Structures are given as structure tokens and as C-alpha cells.
Amino acid sequence: MRSPVPRFRDVERQASGLQPPQCLPSCHERQSSMWFIKDACGIVCAIITWFLVFFAEFVVLFVMLIPSKNLTYSLVNGTLFNSLAFLALASHFRAMCTDPGAVPKGNATKEYIESLQLKPGQVVYKCPKCCSIKPDRAHHCSVCKRCIRKMDHHCPWVNNCVGENNQKYFVLFTMYICLISLHSLVMVVFHFLNCFEDDWTKCSTFSPPATVILLILLCFEGLLFLIFTSVMFGTQVHSICTDETGIEKLKREDPTWEKTQCWEGMKSAFGGPLSVTWFSPFTDLSCQKDDSSPVPMFPQGEIIEEDVIEIPLEPH
């Protein structure tokens, strides 16, 4: 359903705790504390994700590479696969434990709204669940129980929302999982071909039936995750390039913001111009300094009751 009243997009760049337009996600806000969602389903899904990666590691190393007679083949593929798997798990951890862009709770006060210096006739929205002023493009997540800036969706596999501050890590996670899935499938095919040409008893330290079962399981896992993560990766890149989140597409919201170009959106999501840091889950998003006067993140005052606040027009 389309929004009947256009939201006020300037709140996002004027409210403290919400970055100005030229500033990427706040550095001190992201690093101040560990972010973790205590959701049973999400925790189980995250554990399953790590288990499946370690299972793939086990099959690749102990079933295919270590028993191989070709040392160069084992070293090259072992180094490549383990490096990609490590980057995938690191990206998963960052996506899971990074604040996706939560709006501070309880800032829907009269004093706070006055400090924003809004223009007459402008409209701001209060989230009745968070008691906070919702910036444009922020949506409330029922699992995280917070309003998230530029929320794309809540992903149980990373036990977190994918939002403004952690979209980079989610994109990297899907990319690296896609790559190790493809790599494992290629190695399984080569291993099967070598085993058919050679003696199965010399092909692996495991028995032939156990080897076949493990390879089939890895093949099934690799194919499943290759399809899933490649679709998710493409969806996320398309979302960044079109400057429209998944939830905005789902709700068919009319854009009240000025859309950015594809390359500018990529630079914003990944923290600057194209460089090797784009592919690293260990680098934080850079933040430019804002010269505007600061506004208190947690202003004092009573929470207003209205969910839609319109700044009154000046009397003539």
C-alpha cells in the first residue's frame, strides 16, 4: 500500500544518531557496543550456517585434498578454499554483530522535535513501538524490535536485519558463500572423475561408500547454496544500484527521496571509492565529519502521544 502522506526526508540528516547525507554510518555509534539479537530461530540458523561451512571444510580437506597425490593441486585449492571460507565466516559475523542502523529509542519528545528546526508544514512520524522519530526509509522490525534505517529485510541466516550499516557485510557474505559453493562443486566433479579412473580405495582415506555419501552431500549443499546466495547477491546489488530496499519494493512505496546513481550507491554502501577494502569484512565504513551543530542523541522530555506530527504553519 502506498504511503498517503510523503515522509519528511530531512529528519535523517538533522537528527543526532542519524547520519547527514554526506556522511556514511556513524563510526562511534557502530563501535560503541556489541549488537546481537536474542532470537532463537536466528541463533539456530546462524549455527547451522557455520556448521555447514565447517562440514564443507571437512569434506574438501580430508576427503579430497589431503589424500590427493598431487601436492600442488592440494595446496592451491586448499589455500583458496580456506581463504574464501574464512572471509565468508568473517563477513557473516560482521553482518550478524553490526548494528544495522537502529534508530535511538524514546527520542519522540517535543524538545527533540523542536531541536530539529523543522520548517512549517513538514511532517515527521513516530513509531508507536519504539517511541522514536522515524527517519525517511526507516522501518520497524518485529524481530529486532527496533526501527532500522534503510531496512532491506530481516535475515534469519545472519540473525539480524540487513540495513544501512551492515549491508556491505551481508553482500560479502553471500558473495563468498557463492564462491566457495562453486569451488567445492568443481572440486567434487574433478574428484569423481579421478576416482573413476583410479582405484576408489586409493582415492580417499575413507571407505568408498562413505566417500560417495560425503561427496554427494557436499554436492547437494554446494548446489543449494550456490543458487540461493547468487540470487541474494544479485538482489542486494540491484537494490543498491536502484536505491530501493527490498521492503520498499514489497510495499510499493513512492520514493520521497532523491535517488542516487548506481556507482554512488555502491560507494556509499561499501564505504568509499573502489578499492581492496570493498572486499574486506574487517574494514569499517568510513565517515566524513559533519560541521553542523550536534543535537543530543537522547533528549530529555516526555514522549509525545501523536504518531504523525505536522509542524504548524506560521500565522500570517
Curated annotation (Swiss-Prot):
Family to which this protein belongs: Belongs to the DHHC palmitoyltransferase family.
Name this protein carries in UniProt: Palmitoyltransferase ZDHHC3-A
EC number of this enzyme: 2.3.1.225, 2.3.1.-
Lumenal side, ranges: 67-70, 191-212
One of the Pfam families matching this protein, by short name: DHHC
Active-site residues annotated for this sequence: C155
Modifications made to the protein after synthesis: Autopalmitoylated.
Taxonomy of the source species: Eukaryota, Metazoa, Chordata, Craniata, Vertebrata
